[in-house]
Every structure is written in structure tokens, then in C-alpha cells.
């Protein structure tokens, strides 16, 4: 594409035109003949001597072509605009002999219709070229100026509504959100129906939710269903290096929208420009605030009669300016969350359309294996499965490709079978992963073990996949948290039991980070400590739909901090003892599973179930624990969805 950029330059076309004219005059224009030139006096003398056979002339042209008796041709030029006949008569050149036969054949051709114009053009060509160069350079200078002035124009992309490409049929897994947005479609299609009852058309809809849940897709589906134009722009496209550009682009965007009303304006990632004024980590930002003020005026200012609906998407609703999200601007908030199992089935059905599937593919099983996956994750799973099937030269996508794709998306990265591991490393990783699996199988409150492997994938030397219960994604009990802590410590405990304290590796580093985070959250966030009570310690500012804390204000003293550390240590120690007790009771199963992993590298299905059935279950007694609550349940924010968990989250263990 970049190689053809020079074709768009008008200067190139000007050069081509000049070259074409030069070639025309050189080979096709007047005087293009290559015959030899002879003076008119010599021609008259030769004619008097009877050496000339024919003279060709053209009306209005001074040039003549003389043909001699021997066939040679010469060019000559008349001294004036007089005709050839008069010139020959003046010099007494006879055109006929005594017998009346013509001795010199004089041919006078009429002037061509374009000859005069061509002559005029030939004379004016240098002047036209100078004017052309002048206009060209003036336009270049004007273009540079217009480019600078175009900063104030909106960068929104418009999609016509007469040919919708996306409708509600293309969106699955968000039925409640579709119902809310279906009313927006009715507002756009039948505004009189609501106006007759005194209902006011909503000015805006704010869609909030984690990344990949379909906010942009739903907004385009609304435009497709309503059959109206759709303007799409990102919140970061408003503010530029020049002052006032953001407000100018907002005005231009809404001017375009009003000219195409009824229509939809979609602003993606509106938190980039709609952040609360005078707030944030960097303080105030005059240009961004000026842009936000213009958005506020356009959405609910003096001109409120336009049929333009603004749909905005963000995963940071907590930082938006209160004036932006008030009723009258964004009248509705539509929350999109990770789909449940029924939603995932419908999403998978949408994405597998047009793809050849093998007979063993079961979308319901696949949906149950992907709790916490967003719509974008499921789309990626289907695409990765298709890529794997093509790589394996298959004509249909089988369940094996879908299983590999789920692990690839959940853990990150392909299997690294080419990675060379020593026998010692394989042994350590095998016992580590077997420890995770056996502890998980022995605890009733733990997630179900789905697969154990020592094949490296991504940055993990091996991993254990657990299938969380759908009901536990939003609500976690104390027993579930403690079971998860014990499972996470199972790999470290297995290494200690088999190889001793001095031979424990760094393979459990990721597990220890996860254990510490969960235990501290139980004490400081969920109030699951009898010693400290149901109190939240520390005021946290969080990214609500991103699952990361960006700051925490400490609102407790040193003594309370010491007690928190003691409680966290007690919870982790209890989980460590639980994992140790389970593995000591099931040492034979631990050895057999580790040996099977070394031999087969991956255990799943019936082979894994046979080993798990031999594990002796253990029921935790929380009556003596110092970290329970009266009801034993707490709300777990959906900010950190539990995708299939892997036991070994960090780098592979170092050789002992």
C-alpha cells in the first residue's frame, strides 16, 4: 500500500502530462518529419530546371514538401503566407509543357480543424506549465494548512444503517442487557409511540463490565436493529496536542450526528475523557476537562430536541464524573458480566457457525469447562481450535482441538514439548502437580480436578487444571477458601515430604503469592477472622471490573497490623498442615500419580479418575479455627473470575 503512495501525488501526474506532450510534438506534431530541408530559392531553381515532380502544401501553413523526379523529398518553407501557385507563377515556373501535360503536380491540402488550436496550445504551453507549477505549490501549502486545521474535525467512523451487519441475533449470553437495549431500538423506530404518553427518549446508555463481555458488539447490534446510522469513536481520540481540539471534535461529532438523526453515537472507553474533574492520580487536566464539559453540554444542554442516543462503554465506572452519569445524560446503566453456562453455550453456538465440527464436539461440555470465560475468550477458544485443526491437517474441528484451545487461552501459550527437562526436573514437577491434584481430590469443598500434566506450557513447568463449580464463582464460603489454600500449598508440601526441606524448589513461588493474597483478603476484606471480627481493614481504591487494587489507605495502627499478620500466618499454617496430613495419608497414591505423570506426561479422563478414587477424603474441622464467621459465607466480587486453575503458576522448578 505504501508503494502506491506516490501515485496519489498530483505532481507526478503533471510530469507525466508534460512528457506526453513532448513526445507528441516530437513524433506526431508539425515538423515531425525527418526529411532534409532545402531553401525555397533552390526549390524554385530546381523547378525551373524541370527536376521537381510534386509539391505538397497545406492551407495556412508555410511549410511545403517537395518531391523530385528521383523520388527524394525535401522540406522547405515559404517566405510569406502566399500560396505555392502564386509563387511558382511569379518565378515563371511552368506547370504544364507544350503538349499540355502537367510537369509539376501541386497538391494543396486543407488545414486540419485542430491545427489552429494546436498552434495556439503550442504557443501557450510554457505559460500553462508555469501556471500549473504555481497552482501545484499553492495547493501543497494550502494542504499543509488544512491538515493543521483539520485537527478540530471529528475522527468518528460512520456505519450506514440501511445495511446492518450485526443484529441481536449475533449477540449471545447477555439476554438481560439485550432486553434493556431493545427498548432503545423501539425509541429510535417508533418515537411517536412514546411521545404520545409523555415519555422522554433516553439521552444515553452507559454499558459497564469487564473487558471482552461484548459492550461494543451490543452497541453495534442496537444500531443494526434500529436501522440507523452508527458513529463510533474512542474516548482517547478527542484530546490531542493542540488546545481546544477535544471540544471542537465533540462539537463536530454531534453536528454530524444531528445531520444524520436519528442515529447512535458510540464512545468506547469513555473513562479516557470522562474522568472526574480535578481528580485522578495526575491531578486536573484542563484540556480533558474542557472536552468533558463540551460533552456534558451536547448531551443535555439547551438543544435537547435531537433524536441522537449516546452509548458509552467503560470498565472504570468508578472514576467517571458524577455530572456525566446523572439521569438526563446517561439515563441507563447496563451491566455486562461474564456469561453463565447457558450464556456460554449460546456464545459458542454463534462462533462455531460456518465451521465444520466433528461428531464428538459437545458444546455443553465445553461451556462447563470454561467458567469465568468472557465472550471474547470463547471466541478466541473457537478460533484457536480452528487453527489447531488446520495445523494438524484435519478437515473438521474435533473436541481434542477445543480442549487444547481452552488450556491455551486459560494458561497462556502453547505446549512447549521441545523444552528439554532433566529426569530430576521431571520428577520434581511430577510430585509437585500430583500434590495439587491429591489434596484437591481429598477435600470435598475443593474444585474438581480435571487434568494433570508435566508438559510445560507458557511459563509453567507443569500445571493442574481444576473445574470450579458454577455456583461458587460469585459466592465463596470459608471452607472453600481454606480448601483452595490447601490445594495451592499441596505442591510445596509434596516436594517437602518427598525430597526434604533442603530440596524444596522455587516452583511454588506463584502458589505462595496466591495463598498469601487469599489469606490476607479473608482477614482484611471479608471479615472471616473471629479474633478481629467482621471488619474491613484498609480503604482500597480498586479498578472495579479489572480486578486490581491500585491504592490502599491504611486506617489501622501497628498493633492491629501485627494481629492481621498473625491471623494470616495462622490461616496459611492451618492450610499447610491440612495439605501435609492429606499427602501423608495418601503417600502411595502420590507416588503412583507421580510415576504415571513421568511415564505418560498427562493424566486426564478415566486414567486420572482411577487414581483419584483411591484418595482418602478429608473433612476439615473449622470449630477450632480462628478464622470463621457466623454464617460462613461472604460475597466475592466478580472482578477476579475463576477460570480453570493451574497448580503451578510460576516458572518451572529449578533442578535440585
Swiss-Prot record:
Pfam families: AAA, AAA_lid_3, FtsH_ext, Peptidase_M41. It comes from Chloroflexus aggregans (strain MD-66 / DSM 9485). Binds 1 zinc ion per subunit. Keywords: ATP-binding, Cell membrane, Hydrolase, Membrane, Metal-binding, Metalloprotease, Nucleotide-binding, Protease, Transmembrane, Transmembrane helix, Zinc. It is found in: Cell membrane. Zn(2+) binds at residues 432, 436, 511. This is ATP-dependent zinc metalloprotease FtsH. Homohexamer. The gene is ftsH. ATP binds at residues 209-216. Its EC number is 3.4.24.-. InterPro entries: AAA+_ATPase (IPR003593), AAA_lid_3 (IPR041569), ATPase_AAA_core (IPR003959), ATPase_AAA_CS (IPR003960), FtsH (IPR005936), P-loop_NTPase (IPR027417), Pept_M41_FtsH_extracell (IPR011546), Peptidase_M41 (IPR000642).
Amino acid at each position: 500500500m505504501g508503494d502506491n503512495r506516490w501515485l496519489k501525488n498530483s505532481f507526478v501526474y503533471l510530469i507525466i502530462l508534460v512528457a506526453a506532450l513532448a513526445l507528441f510534438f516530437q513524433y506526431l506534431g508539425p515538423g515531425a518529419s525527418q526529411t532534409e530541408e532545402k531553401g525555397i530559392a533552390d526549390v524554385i531553381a530546381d523547378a525551373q530546371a524541370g527536376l521537381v515532380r510534386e509539391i505538397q502544401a497545406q492551407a495556412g501553413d508555410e511549410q511545403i514538401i517537395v518531391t523530385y523526379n528521383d523520388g527524394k523529398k525535401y522540406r522547405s518553407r515559404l517566405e510569406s503566407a502566399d500560396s505555392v501557385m502564386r509563387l511558382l507563377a511569379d518565378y515563371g515556373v511552368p506547370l504544364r509543357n507544350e503538349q499540355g501535360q502537367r510537369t509539376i503536380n501541386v497538391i494543396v491540402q486543407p488545414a486540419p480543424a485542430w491545427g489552429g488550436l494546436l498552434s495556439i496550445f503550442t504557443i501557450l504551453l510554457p505559460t500553462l506549465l508555469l501556471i500549473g507549477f504555481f497552482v501545484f505549490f499553492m495547493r501543497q501549502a494550502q494542504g499543509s494548512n488544512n491538515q493543521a486545521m483539520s485537527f478540530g474535525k471529528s475522527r468518528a467512523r460512520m456505519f450506514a444503517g440501511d445495511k446492518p451487519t450485526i443484529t441481536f441475533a449475533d449477540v449471545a449470553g447477555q439476554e438481560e442487557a439485550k432486553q434493556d437495549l431493545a427498548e432503545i431500538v423501539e425509541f429510535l423506530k417508533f418515537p411517536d409511540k412514546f411521545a404520545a404518553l409523555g415519555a422522554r427518549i433516553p439521552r444515553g446508555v452507559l454499558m459497564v463490565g469487564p473487558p471482552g463481555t461484548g459492550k461494543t458488539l451490543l452497541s453495534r447490534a442496537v444500531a443494526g436493529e434500529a436501522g440507523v446510522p452508527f458513529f463510533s469513536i474512542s474516548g482517547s481520540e478527542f484530546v490531542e496536542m493542540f488546545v481546544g481540539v477535544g471540544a471542537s471534535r465533540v462539537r463536530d461529532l454531534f453536528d454530524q450526528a444531528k445531520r444524520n438523526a436519528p442515529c447512535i453515537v458510540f464512545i468506547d472507553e469513555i473513562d479516557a475523557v470522562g474522568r472526574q474533574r480535578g481528580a485522578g492520580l495526575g491531578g486536573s487536566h484542563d484540556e480533558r476537562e474542557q472536552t468533558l464539559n463540551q460533552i456534558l453540554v451536547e448531551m443535555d444542554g439547551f438543544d435537547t430536541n435531537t433524536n441522537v442516543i449516546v452509548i458509552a462503554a467503560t470498565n472504570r465506572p468508578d472514576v467517571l464524573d458524577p455530572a456525566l452519569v446523572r439521569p438526563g445524560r446517561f439515563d441507563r446503566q447496563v451491566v455486562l458480566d461474564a456469561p453463565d453456562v447457558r450464556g456460554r453455550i449460546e456464545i459458542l453456538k454463534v462462533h462455531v457457525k460456518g465451521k465444520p465440527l466433528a461428531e464428538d464436539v459437545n458444546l455443553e461440555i465445553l461451556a462447563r469447562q470454561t467458567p469465568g470465560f468472557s465472550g471474547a475468550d470463547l471466541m478466541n477458544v473457537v478460533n484457536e481450535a480452528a487453527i489447531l485443526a488446520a495445523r494438524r491437517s484435519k478437515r473438521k474441528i474435533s473436541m481434542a482441538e477445543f480442549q487444547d484451545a481452552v488450556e491455551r487461552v486459560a494458561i497462556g501459550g502453547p505446549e512447549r514439548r521441545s523444552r528439554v527437562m532433566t529426569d530430576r526436573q521431571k520428577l520434581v514437577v511430577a510430585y509437585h502437580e500430583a500434590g495439587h491434584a491429591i489434596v484437591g481430590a481429598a477435600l470435598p469443598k475443593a474444585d474438581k480436578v480435571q487434568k494433570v500434566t508435566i508438559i510445560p506450557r507458557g511459563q509453567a513447568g507443569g500445571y493442574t487444571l481444576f473445574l470450579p463449580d458454577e455456583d461458587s464463582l460469585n459466592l465463596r464460603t470459608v471452607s472453600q477458601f481454606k480448601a483452595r489454600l490447601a490445594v495451592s500449598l499441596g505442591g510445596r508440601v509434596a516436594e517437602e515430604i518427598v525430597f526434604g526441606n533442603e530440596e524444596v524448589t522455587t516452583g511454588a513461588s506463584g502458589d505462595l503469592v496466591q495463598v498469601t493474597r487469599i489469606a490476607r483478603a479473608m482477614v482484611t476484606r471479608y471479615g472471616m477472622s473471629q479474633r478481629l471480627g467482621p471488619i474491613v481493614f484498609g480503604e482500597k481504591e480498586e479498578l472495579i471490573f479489572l480486578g486490581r487494587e491500585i491504592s490502599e489507605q491504611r486506617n489501622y495502627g501497628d498493633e492491629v497490623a501485627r494481629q492481621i499478620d498473625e491471623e494470616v500466618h495462622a490461616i496459611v499454617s492451618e492450610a499447610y498442615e491440612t495439605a501435609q496430613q492429606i499427602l501423608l495419608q495418601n503417600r502411595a497414591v502420590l507416588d503412583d500419580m507421580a510415576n504415571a505423570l513421568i511415564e505418560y506426561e498427562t493424566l486426564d479422563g478415566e486414567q486420572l479418575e482411577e487414581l483419584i478414587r483411591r484418595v482418602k477424603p478429608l473433612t476439615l474441622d473449622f470449630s477450632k479455627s480462628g478464622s470463621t464467621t457466623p454464617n460462613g459465607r461472604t460475597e466475592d466480587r466478580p472482578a477476579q473470575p475463576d477460570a480453570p486453575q493451574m497448580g503451578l503458576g510460576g516458572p518451572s522448578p529449578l533442578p535440585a
